[in-house]
């Protein structure tokens, strides 16, 4: 009776033990496999795996029908086995004791392991989904920024095209201004070198004609628009500038004449409503020539180069003094001529008084004399 009771109790206790634990205990307790796996010599509640390769090839297929060593280790962790030594495959459990197989019923499988792994996996999936959603939002924001930048780039390109067009127009205007400045400087240099040229240009050509008064000068009658002839009894004097051998002054006079006619300068000089033309007393120190040479759009002519070269090489101290005196006379004569032209007589219609006619004749002869002395 007692024997049967013990047997029944043993069978009931063994039936409550998990198959993995029972097989693992038999494998460790087998003395024939002590070279592969055995009880730990330092403790009764632990065992050590000595040869993992042979253990995976021979013992695992024999007891568990697989040869996966990692799966065996994972099963040990599920049942609460812990690794004792980090350098060896030694595992211990308080219910896994040598010679006390009945204590295996105290070893309980941990159920929260699978749930924790599952929850960990779920949390990982949730985190990944959140990160993915955040990345997609950033992509959408970047797309919007790209569209805004594209529109701004189009506006900048349009503004650049408009600016380039304005710059081209501005360059054309600046070039025209430089050309006009160059023409004006050329004219001023020409007048400073030949003051008689200005007197010739200021004489009206259409209604009044001046000629040199000499012996036997004839009195010319001026015919008005109504066909009436007005005789003033005055000699008509025309000013003839001194002719150079090379004929340079004549060609320059024609060019300047055309320039002044195009610019309506003659009308401006003879109009009483405008400010009177005043020719200042200036010394010929070569400033106009220097300014002309420094002009950005300057086109040098042979005459200008010869003048500059002559002024640098051949001008002596005595010549400078003489030139200064002559230029003072020129400036003074130009001033007198301008004052005579500004007097409120009916100069435009040729009604000159004898006194003014004589003054102009004297001034003209003096200007001719100064021009011939050059």
Curated annotation (Swiss-Prot):
Q: Which GO terms describe its cellular component?
A: cytoplasm; nucleus
Q: Which SUPFAM superfamilies match?
A: Winged helix' DNA-binding domain (SSF46785)
| Motif AHA1 in this chain | 285-294
Which segment of this protein is annotated as the motif Nuclear localization signal? 298-303
Extract the SMART domains matched here: HSF
Q: Name one Pfam family in it.
A: HSF_DNA-bind
Q: Which GO terms describe its molecular function?
A: DNA-binding transcription factor activity; transcription cis-regulatory region binding
Q: Which Gene3D superfamilies match?
A: Winged helix-like DNA-binding domain superfamily/Winged helix DNA-binding domain
- Where mainly found? cytoplasm
- Show where the record puts the motif AHA2: 330-339
Task: Give the DNA-binding residues.
Answer: 17-112
Location of motif Nuclear export signal in this chain is 363-370
Note what the entry says on domains: The hydrophobic-rich region (HR-A/B) corresponds to the oligomerization domain. AHA motifs are transcriptional activator elements.
Q: Subunit structure of this entry?
A: Homotrimer.
* Family membership: Belongs to the HSF family. Class A subfamily.
Q: What is this protein called?
A: Heat stress transcription factor A-8
Recall the taxonomic lineage recorded for the source organism: Eukaryota, Viridiplantae, Streptophyta, Embryophyta, Tracheophyta
Q: Which gene encodes it?
A: HSFA8
